[in-house]
Amino acid sequence: MANDKNKNSNDYIEQILPTSNEEEMKRMMKELDREQSYREHKCCRQYITVFISVIFVIFQLYATLSGAITAQVLRATHLAFVQLLAFLLFPPTKNSPRNTLPWYDIVLGLIGAACWLYIVVNFDSLVRRSGNNTPLDVAVGIVGILVLFESCRRIVGLPIMIIAGSFIVFAFAGKYLPGFLHHRGYSLQRVVCHLFYNTEGIMGTPIGACSTFIFLFILFGALLEKTGIGHFFIDVCNALAGGASGGPAKVAVLSSALLGTVSGSSVSNTVGSGSFTIPMMKKLGYKGEFAGAVEAAASTGGQIMPPIMGAAAFLMAESLGLPYITIVKAAIVPAILYFTGIFITVHLEAKKLGLKGLPKEQLPRFMPLLLKKGYMILPLVVIIYFLCAGKTAVFAALMGIIACVLVGFGVSVSDLAHGRKPSFGGKDIVEIMCTAARNIISVAIACGMAGIIIGIVTLTGLGLRLGNGLVMLAHGKLLLTLVFTMVASIILGMGAPTTANYLITSTITAGAIISLGIEPLAAHMFAFYFGIIADVTPPVALAAIAGAAIAKAKPMKTAINATKLAIGAFIIPYMFVYNSKMLMINASALSVVMIIVTAILGMFGISVALEGYGFNNTGFFYNSRKGKTTIIAFDALERILFAVAGLLCVIPEAKTDIIGVSLLAALIAYQLILKKVRGAKATV
């Protein structure tokens, strides 16, 4: 009987999943995600790229385990591997053929690698003549920076490239700029040597993080991907929420929150999990624009989801000098509120459209699934345990990698014992190494560009200038400063992976908020939130565009829907700046609970206002024809009142909470009474 049920479950899931084969899925991912648009070499070229990738991973593991390589040499070697592989694997444009390797890409890859190996070979002499660089040093630096920009154009995209280029222009043109942007300007030699050879430039904190724990977490993610944890998470979420109203959308929210925290890229997560969840949502009855928006908003939210936050949590702990566990605790409540807001909106949309869930008898059962495949989450449990125990990110990642390998080989032993073909072996390890080496390329290049931005900030003092400028423009008013910081962070965050996003926004914009007496942790979280939300905010909205492409929907309409779904991310940061107890800073358990309850009520009110649907979708007015109620638009005044009640609830003041909760209760009571009078069926 159980076997029949599992068979029915599998048959039903196959019906609602996309019908495209694996090759079609790969093609879609290559079109939507720059990181997946790599060449697939054959024969000799394949062996060469595989060999370089494996050597790269072995070098990284050796450097991490031995600690015998100095920081600058490690970072330069890391960049040399990245630049070589970038041009061997990624074609010049999206439309370039992926089955050929032009001679000029080989040359560019070798030149890029040679520029960084120049530092490795001449490290001692470069240290001795620091500040007195030769013309050759300058020439190598110029070429290295230009090649880095070209690889950024190919793989990461134009937004971060344009931003970094603008900062370099700022360094040269300072004496021609007005107001707080004015500075004396710097020579070509000074700018190039500061960016290329200094640990405050390209080889600064971003690449330092990338060449150590970020690389290890990407390797860990590649191992998890090979074990099939993505499908496991989707199955678990289907078991938990698939049968609820609008089940597939809720599955998308839950699974993207779980997967997104590890991925480090909202676009990659949208493409990866969206290729399954978006067709499920459309099959159930959601419009394409809404289905793509749900996945984009949820995947973007995964980057602010503890415990890993796309590796930004470790960078934040290092930047602020705080324990990692403090960062995780601070991120918990905002993340809960963000996903609660999306969940409520998804539920209301399902009710408005009259969408049911997937038949429960045809969905996987939670406990049997957990007993059969629960071992897959063991590596994540290991990482979280060691991080919470106060171990370093590097140590925790290494333990997670070891746990992944042990689980993989354990499954293979079980396969052999039952006469099956082993599902994990030497070939899989090589594939995992190649995947990790390929996936680190975009992150490393983005971190290099972030290093350029941070390098110009440290050279010119732009961080202080911009902070003072924002405060001056806001006339010292906190609210206006927050608004200006929000806009600046969204612009700076466009197209940047999570780690680079945090480093750029926290370096440039967070200082303005801190200067007004706000907790540094709250200021950094504020800047980071809005940098991340750039992925669903028009006009760039890369995650929303990826979701729209999978859903075959209009990109701008999808981006607008994603922004509506992610409305919590535009409200929550203001809440924790004005009330740091939300970040569990000097907060009692009771105060945190009160904040969560009132904020969830507030998110409900705002979601009802945005959706135009609540306990009763006919608003103040309704029509009847032949004894049947005709559904008409939610009344504008009612929507405004729900929005006001919601905003009052999220404002962190006791008086506004009381007024907001009272108004919300009155509106809900009115809708319930109206529904009872009409004899309408319950909708929530």
Q: What would you call each of these model-derived segments?
A:
Residues 221-225, 256-265, 297-303, 454, ...:
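Transmembrane alpha-helix interface/packing and boundary motifs in multi-pass membrane proteins
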Residues 49-54, 74-88, 104-113, 138-147, ...:
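Hydrophobic mid-bilayer segments of alpha-helices in multi-pass membrane transport proteins
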Residues 2-44, 332-439, 542-645, 675-684:
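Long, contiguous bundles of hydrophobic transmembrane helices that form the permeation core
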Residues 1-128, 138-142:
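Conserved, well-structured core domains of diverse proteins
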Residues 63-67, 89-100, 125-126, 144-158, ...:
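Membrane-water interface regions at transmembrane-helix termini and the short interhelical loops
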Residues 135-139, 200-213, 239-253, 284-290, ...:
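Membrane-interfacial loop-to-helix junctions in multi-pass transporters
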Residues 150-151, 155, 165-180, 188-192, ...:
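Core transmembrane alpha-helical segments of multi-pass membrane transporters/permeases
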Residues 234-302, 308-315, 321, 498-530, ...:
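Hydrophobic transmembrane alpha-helices that form the pore/transport pathway of multi-pass ion
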